[in-house]
Structure formats: structure tokens, C-alpha cells
Amino acid sequence: FRFIPGIYHNLPDTLRRIPFPGNANGCHDNLVASTEVMFARTGGREDIRLPFSMIGTPPPVLTPDAFLRMLTGLLQTATHLPAHEIAYFANRLLVFLTSCDRRRLEVWEHTPWWRFVRAASMSPDYQRLLAIGLTRNIVATKAEIASTRTVATCAEAFVFNVLGRGADGQPDRVLNLPTNEAWIDPWVAHLRSLGVAFRVGWSVRDLRLAGGRIAEAVVTDPQGARQSVVADHFVQAMPVEHARRTWNVAVRAADPQLARCDKLATDWMTGIQFYLTEPTPIIHGHINHIDSPWSLTSVGQAQYWKSRDVPADYGDGTVADCLSVDISEWDKPGILYGKTAKQCTREEIAQEVWAQMKGGLNDTGEHVLLDAKLHSWFLDPAVGGLGTPHPTNDEQLLIHPTGTWFNRPASRTAIPNLFLAGDYVAVDIDLATMEGANASARQAVNALLDASGSGAGRCTVTPLYRAPEFAALKRHDETRYRLGLPNAFDLG
């Protein structure tokens, strides 16, 4: 599924620029808001089902006290945790929000989220909901190693989104059609109309340096034949695990930041879709299967496709819904076979994911997911070799252990005609997302235009929202940081 929250600004701007028949705002008009979120619990505990949208009347001025009261109220409603744990977590977010940029970069970037929120001394539910749940299911990074700067930046953005501050829209938005129909196909058509040529099935093998510049890219066609691509400028928009294979010794020597990319870590976050013979809109939003060993997140998609009759428009006429699931944990044993996802066959993964979802949705007497209603499933073909000693994943996700920021490259490289774009490039959102990739591409275009001396207009790169009320507190924290003092709100 595609999750496009209101904290995004650069990607939504691109969506507005892609024409779509009947839409005044292009593909952006294909975004629809979800209204709920659920934390599915196991062991007979009731699931936590909450409204999830911008609040009606946010405070006009956000003081630290107003922030703590608002966040405490939200957490009391959402988590049912002990009062002292809620108070502590709210305080930790306030510490981050009022931390100066230097403290964020030099301290919190090196601090694991688990330690920042003192998860080791808190209840199992605190650990599951606020420490692990905010990291493994969202950024596919273990809480014990995830950068506090990355996790808290994301949390800060969502808090302001819920408050209606600086948002492009509601905090949870999805597409009103399958992704290809709502976005990709119109985008491809638009780019082709502008003269873009796509070469599907081709691979970049090497970038060759001559005279301090990239002279050619060596590529292979679908038949494996090597060819040379010569250009004035090269924009490399590839996932980091693929891009760094193309940087030979000479290219790496020309720009040390490329060699540092070898330290960037990736992990598996891969999707599976279950096709059901009856509509199964469990909630109008995403479900975080918070207790699932494989860190599952799911959403029922047909409820958003109002212009489609799913049985008539797709498949063999018997499928009525699509339950789309992200699997974020591939290295822990499941509940059926005692094997990790990487050790399971494709069939075993489907059975295991289905069982884990039922464990959280069917455990309180309701029959939400029924085996008899399962028509078929589809696991991302990017994963291969499952059930063998050598599983592979061609589409891994950048993860964010402490210190990751310092290994992320800029879009502009020391090679004057090579520019980088991708979710691993350093951008304001500091999270491997479609928004981050989009922002990095805008940076790359601007750097290329600068390098070529072009008089063309530059791309707008929009950062995350920052509350102006906290600017003075952050300046005060800058002084405290220079003096070696903790943040004024930091209780330890």
C-alpha cells in the first residue's frame, strides 16, 4: 500500500503536477484520508481503535505546558499506560522538540531511541507501544539501535500534523485507486509526453571516470549486452544498495562521501497482498499488529476505491477486497513453524502472516478474518530464494541506526557532473520515504542547474514544519548546550 501522510510536502507537490483526467489538482486529488488507526493486540486483549485525523480546534499558541497536556491526553486515550509512564514519554518528546539543532545532531543522533525513552525500565506495554511500535513498524529499525533524531523527528512531524500545523493534509492518506491507476501510469504518460524515454530491464553496471568527470555509464540491456551511455550530466536515482555497486575505485576516490555509503544499513520491509471473496473493511485506516512477531501493518484497500466494482473490474469476478500487508521483521521466528520469514517458503510466509493477523484480530471472539474467504495471495516478487540458505531481496529499505546521518551523502557530489537522488541521500525528513526520495531529486536537479549555470527556475524543497513558538526555547537550548548543560526540560 501507499501511505502519504500530511507531513509530506514535496511528493504531494509532484502529484499536483501530474495530470489526471477530471482532476483539477492532478494525481493529488486521488489522495483520500483515512479516519482511524488500530493497534491489534493478542492474547484476548481488546484492540485499541482510535480516530486519527487533525483535531478540530488546535491551540492557537503552543506553549510547553499546552503541548504536554495535549500529548498526555492523546496518550492516555490511545495507550492506557500508567500515568507516570505517559508523563515521562510526553516529557521526552518535549525535550526533543525544544532541543537545538546541534544537540539533535551531536547527541540525539548518537542516542538509541530505546535509551532515550528509558524503555528498559518501563512496562512491557510501554516498550511495545511507544518504543518498539514507533520504530520497527514504521522505519523497520530496532528500537535498541534506532537513532533518536530520526524517530523523534518523525514523531514531532506527526504531532504537528494532528494539530493541523503546516500540513499538506490529513495525517493518514492513501490512494483512491490501485497505485498504477492512481499515480504511476499517469506519471509515466506525462513524462513520456515531455520526452522522457524509459528503458525497462536495463541495468547500470559501472560509472567510468575520465578527467575528473563521469565520462560514461556502462549499462546492460535485457539480453545482457553491454552498452555505453554518454551524457553531459548523470543523475543517479537508485537505491543505495544498487548505486554503490556502480561506484568503482576511481569514482569512490574522487568523492569520499560515496565510500561512506558502504556503512549505510538496509533491511527487509516487504509486502504481501491477500485477496478476499467478501469486503473486509476492518477499520477505515491502517492496522498496526503491534504484538505480531513479524511486525505487520495492514490496510483494507477496496473501501477506498469508490469508483471501482472490485469483482467486476479485477480478477476472476470472485475477489471483493484486497488486504495489503507490510512485513517489517524477517529475522524473528513466527508462530506456526518456528522459523524466521527468511527461512520460510513463500507459501509458509503467506500462512504465517495470515495466522499472525488472525491472532490479533480474531482473539476476542470476533471472526474478522475467515479462512473460507481467502481467495489467494501475492508476495512481492523482489524477494527470492526463500526457504533456502541464501534468501535475497532486490528492494531493501534503508534503516536508521545511530550515526546513520553522518554516512548519508549530499545530492551534489565532488564529481561535477554526478548527482545523487534516492531515499538514502541527506534531506530534512531524515527518513527513508517517498518524500525523502522526492526531496533529494529536487536537490539533485538544483545542483545540476547550478553546475551548468542554467538560468532556469530552481525546484522548491520544502522542509518539515517547525513550530515558531519553540524557536526561542531552541535558541536557549543552544546556549545551554554550548555550556555543557542538559536541555532545560530534561529530567534524565
Residue ranges, per PLM feature:
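Dinucleotide-binding Rossmann-like beta1-alpha1 core, especially the glycine-rich loop
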Residues: 1-88
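Conserved beta-strand->loop/alpha-helix structural units within folded catalytic cores of enzymes
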Residues: 8, 120, 194-196, 200, ...
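Amphipathic alpha-helical segments that form well-ordered structural scaffolds
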Residues: 10-17, 112, 116, 182-193, ...
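Rossmann-like nucleotide/phosphate-binding core characteristic of flavoprotein oxidoreductases
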Residues: 68-138, 347, 351-373, 403-406, ...
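Active-site/ligand-binding neighborhood in enzyme catalytic cores
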Residues: 76-213
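C-terminal segments that line or cap access tunnels to active or ligand-binding sites in enzymes
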Residues: 164-175, 231-233, 238-408, 414-439, ...
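Conserved beta-strand-loop-beta-strand element in the redox core of flavoprotein oxidoreductases
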Residues: 208-229
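Active-site-proximal substrate-binding core of FAD-dependent oxidoreductases
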Residues: 447-492
